[in-house]
């Protein structure tokens, strides 16, 4: 059997996936753009560094020309330092006519970035620039200028700081925009998931998904709501059918009274309650007199009308807490619970018998009369089980029917108190006419 795979919580949520995707795309885009701008800037700086270095060398050659002519090393060094110190130069050397160094200048190593500047100059700048020193058109010496990587390092550090700042700003912007986008996408999906979870767990088919701001998600919500409409309708029909089947299984189709199975179950629960609370209850077994004669002489339709009227008249003499059921044929049973005394059961039985004095009107306009014979069994005096109570009430009904139809009789019990109550009620009740 295929088992449905359940979500374990180890997979990332859609919200997190979208956040990661948006942030990753933004960071990659900014990093790529920053790297491209940095490379272009470095190439541009290098393109301008070589001509600038040549201009510096030419300017130095003009400045130290007189000092080289007169061989004044001190003047050459002063002129050299004056120009080189203010330019992007790491070192400058003036050579005389014989190629011997006449004056030199080297930028002092200051700060921990000096080595990095030298390395950048070695990687990115061209070889030292050499410029001849001319006097009256004759070469009297030369100047060698070596560029510095300070500008390159400052550019790289500034570019790196700018890139980091852009990355931070981009991350914040991407997070803000992603939240808005995710709210529009994940929000409706979360609502749909919550509704689906509620429907699955609580069977609440009245839940609906609210409208989303995105067309596709809105269409999905409408389709899901339409599915819920169908499920709600199907669930309602199923509940109605189940209720109807349950009613049919426990009720008589003709009189709509509970059947024997329902009565016995209710009687069992009533006995447990009576035992726990030390209360009394009574079971009345009722049989219709002359019903077979009416059914054979007037037909089944007349017999059905008689049964329906009997059920209505019995129900009319009972309390809301009492129960009347049709056991089958023309036999009925009544459960009286709770019961103050056995005398109350006898009085209710007399009321039921008296309710049958009025004739029953049939569908053709004619009338027919019938009577009821009732047997009564009490708990706990006569029996303490459903079967025993029904049996005792049934036996009492048959004895009463043999003695006089349209009467009632209490089950046999050698209890003087119960017998005395029955005698007192019998003496106060007019004798029923023979049937």
From Swiss-Prot:
Cellular component, GO annotation: plasma membrane
Domain GGDEF, residue spans: 279-415
Nucleotidyltransferase listed as a keyword: no
Annotated stretches, region: Disordered: 414-435
Membrane topology: Multi-pass membrane protein
Residue ranges occupied by any HAMP domain in the UniProt entry: 183-236
All ranges on the Cytoplasmic side of the membrane: 1-22, 176-435
Any one of the GO BP annotations: signal transduction
InterPro entries linked: CHASE8, DGC-Regulatory_Protein, GGDEF_dom, HAMP_dom, Nucleotide_cyclase, Rev_trsase/Diguanyl_cyclase
Function according to Swiss-Prot or TrEMBL: Catalyzes the synthesis of cyclic-di-GMP (c-di-GMP) via the condensation of 2 GTP molecules. Important for the regulation of biofilm maintenance when exposed to peroxide. Part of the YfiB-TpbB-YfiR (or yfiBNR) system, encoding a tripartite signaling module that modulates intracellular c-di-GMP levels. The system is a key regulator of the small colony variant (SCV) phenotype, and plays an important role in biofilm formation and in vivo persistence. The c-di-GMP produced by TpbB/YfiN stimulates the production of the Pel and Psl exopolysaccharides, which promotes surface attachment, generates an SCV phenotype and confers resistance against phagocytosis.
Name of this chain's protein: Diguanylate cyclase TpbB
Species name: Pseudomonas aeruginosa (strain UCBPP-PA14)
Taxonomic classification: Bacteria, Pseudomonadati, Pseudomonadota, Gammaproteobacteria, Pseudomonadales
């Amino acid at each position: 059997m295929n088992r449905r795979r359940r979500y374990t919580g180890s997979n990332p949520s859609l919200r997190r996936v979208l956040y990661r995707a948006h942030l990753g795309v933004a960071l990659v885009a900014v990093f790529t753009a920053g790297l491209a701008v940095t490379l272009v800037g470095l190439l541009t700086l290098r393109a301008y560094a070589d001509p600038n270095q040549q201009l510096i060398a030419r300017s130095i050659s003009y400045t130290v020309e007189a000092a080289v002519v007169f061989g004044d090393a001190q003047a050459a060094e002063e002129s050299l330092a004056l120009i080189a110190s203010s330019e992007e130069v790491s070192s400058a050397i003036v050579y005389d006519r014989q190629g011997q160094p006449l004056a030199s200048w080297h930028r002092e190593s200051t700060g921990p970035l000096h080595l990095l500047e030298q390395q950048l100059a070695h990687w990115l700048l061209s070889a030292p620039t050499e410029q001849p020193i001319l006097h009256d058109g004759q070469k009297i010496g030369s100047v060698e200028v070596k560029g510095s990587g300070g500008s390159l390092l400052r550019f790289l550090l500034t570019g790196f700081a700018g890139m980091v700042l852009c990355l931070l700003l981009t991350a914040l912007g991407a997070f803000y925009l992603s939240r808005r986008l995710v709210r529009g996408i994940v929000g409706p999906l979360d609502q749909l998931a919550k509704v689906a979870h509620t429907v699955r767990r609580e069977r609440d088919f009245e839940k609906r998904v609210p409208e989303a701001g995105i067309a596709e998600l809105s269409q999905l919500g409408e389709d899901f709501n339409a599915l819920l409409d169908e499920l709600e309708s199907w669930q309602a029909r199923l509940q109605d059918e189940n209720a109807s089947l349950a009613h049919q299984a426990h009720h008589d189709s003709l009189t709509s009274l509970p059947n024997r199975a329902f009565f016995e179950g209710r009687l069992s629960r009533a006995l447990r309650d009576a035992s726990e609370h030390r209360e009394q209850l009574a079971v009345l077994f009722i049989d219709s007199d002359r019903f077979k004669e009416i059914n054979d002489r007037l037909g089944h339709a007349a017999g059905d009308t008689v049964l329906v009227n009997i059920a209505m008249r019995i129900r009319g003499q009972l309390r809301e807490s009492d129960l009347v059921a049709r056991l089958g044929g023309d036999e009925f049973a009544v459960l009286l619970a709770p019961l103050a005394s056995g005398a109350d059961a006898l009085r209710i039985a007399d009321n039921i018998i008296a309710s049958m004095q009025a004739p029953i009107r049939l569908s053709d306009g004619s009338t027919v009369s019938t009577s009821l014979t009732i047997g009564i069994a009490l708990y706990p005096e006569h029996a303490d089980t459903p079967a025993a109570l029904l049996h005792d009430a049934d036996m009492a009904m048959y004895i009463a029917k043999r003695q006089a139809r349209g009467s009632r009789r209490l089950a046999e019990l050698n209890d003087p108190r119960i017998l005395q109550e029955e005698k007192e009620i019998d003496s106060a009740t007019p004798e029923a006419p023979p049937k």
